């Protein structure tokens, strides 16, 4: 959600069926409106509790020229959080960044027969041109090192990136 925003920010319009059977549409062509509540964001944020979404209009992003993923472990959650804070404060346009604590890593190791170091981990993904991805990743790697982060485990190939993110999704 760092670079592209949350799902709520990427849904432009909806068709919703309410519990009583009424159907209504939200959203429109204008980006801003002062005409009351933003029902699109309200419905998306409710995750299905206010109505059944039958159609939606999404904001689409182009496929980046280059994508790289990395995993980095830290001795403490605070070290990982400080890395996240500094990365965001520096304005680095990171595509994805997620923190997984040591208890979750331990559970993933046991359940999925993995052998990750039992410590907090940051899962990162960088999008852009080859040069910008390289620059972003080097900068974040330096920041992580300043907060006792391990060397990044990298991948630019789709299959390997998916493998790196597997433990995060398994959590």
Describe each PLM feature range.
Residues 1-98:
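FAD-binding subdomain of flavoenzyme oxidoreductases
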Residues 58-62, 68, 72-76, 81-171:
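C-terminal substrate-recognition/cap domain of FAD-linked oxidoreductases
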């Amino acid at each position: 959600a760092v670079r592209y925003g949350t799902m709520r920010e990427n849904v432009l319009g909806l068709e919703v069926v309410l519990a009583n059977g009424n159907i209504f549409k939200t959203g429109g062509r204008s980006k801003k409106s002062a005409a009351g509540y933003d029902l699109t964001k309200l419905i998306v944020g409710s995750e299905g509790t206010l109505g059944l979404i039958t159609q939606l209009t999404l904001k689409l992003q182009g496929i980046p020229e280059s994508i790289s993923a990395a995993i980095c472990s830290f001795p403490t959650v605070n070290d990982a959080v400080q890395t996240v804070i500094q990365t965001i404060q520096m304005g680095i346009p990171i595509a994805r960044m997620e923190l997984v604590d040591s208890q979750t890593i331990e559970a993933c190791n046991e359940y999925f027969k993995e052998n990750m170091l039992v410590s907090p981990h940051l899962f990162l993904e960088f999008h852009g041109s080859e040069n910008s991805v390289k620059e972003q990743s080097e900068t974040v790697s330096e920041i992580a090192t300043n907060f006792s982060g391990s060397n990044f485990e990298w991948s630019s190939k789709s299959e390997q990136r998916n493998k790196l993110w597997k433990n995060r999704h398994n959590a």
